[in-house]
Amino acid sequence: MKTFCHFSLRLARRLPLLLLPAILLLLITTPPLAAMTLEEAMDALGEAKAQGQLGEQPDGYLGVVEDNSRAETIARLINEARREEYRRVARDNNIDLRDVELLAGQKAIERTPAGQYIRMPDGRWRRK
């Protein structure tokens, strides 16, 4: 029994070293998960909205209606781009950023087709 335990402890100590080649092989041969680009997010936006995953909000930004990582990534990338554009418009026109966001939100909600989600002022989502 002592021999078996001693052997097991030695193997347990060496196991990470024995697995290292297999782990390295996996790292080398597995392609990395590519991060979504803004262009890909913009291409995926229409489908995500049509599927009820994303919707327009009064603050000018996209909101996640149905939690999933893809929808969250699309919203994050597009919202970052929107925020940059809103800042530029506010700066160029010497107006408050919040005013630009609210106007953009109003226009986005007006342009949202029937059947897609919009966020109500009370925070609830509803189909337009």
Residue map of PLM features:
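Anionic, Ser/Thr-rich low-complexity intrinsically disordered regions
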Residues: 2, 34-128
